[in-house]
């Protein structure tokens, strides 16, 4: 505790909406944090060593990524893991995945336009729309004994609304855990292109897969589509 980490100090409010008066049936040391975004595994030595090396420079000013090596490392990872390549000028840094999502929704959608996503959904897709006073449109996934699939007829119907200008995809899907197959992504891509929509593909959890699963970036399926934004995060890679 006393780290200001969500994993140790913030989970009571974040998950349980609890204040300091709420009593939990277990002691803190008995909890094992295994939520997808913040598992209780130690940071690798190579990362710790890199931070220590940076600390030794003793100068901490405004920071941006200026070195080509960052792009080279990230691009090499995407090529080796997903056989996916992209131009260096298309890699843009942000101050965080959630702030970037909020900013993109407000930038892409005009005040009278709508945001479409699959439900159940990562809650911040709706929060981002709410923050910009944009309407949310939900296309419910089909639940067959815990295996979720896309209702393409419903998705296409809702995407056809000219006021629905942005589709947010979660790939792999949160919270169902579905890793979308290539044919599924192609069908999604066809609907997006047909309606000339913007699409944000949230691929944050792309490397947290079971051994028999394979992540396919939407950008690999739609390599020439100019209204596609892929969200990724190096700290989970």
Q: Residue ranges of each PLM-predicted region?
A:
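Conserved core of the PLP fold type I
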Residues: 60-190, 207-208, 212-225, 229-230
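Metal-dependent active-site segment of extracytoplasmic phospho-/sulfohydrolases and closely related
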Residues: 197-198, 209
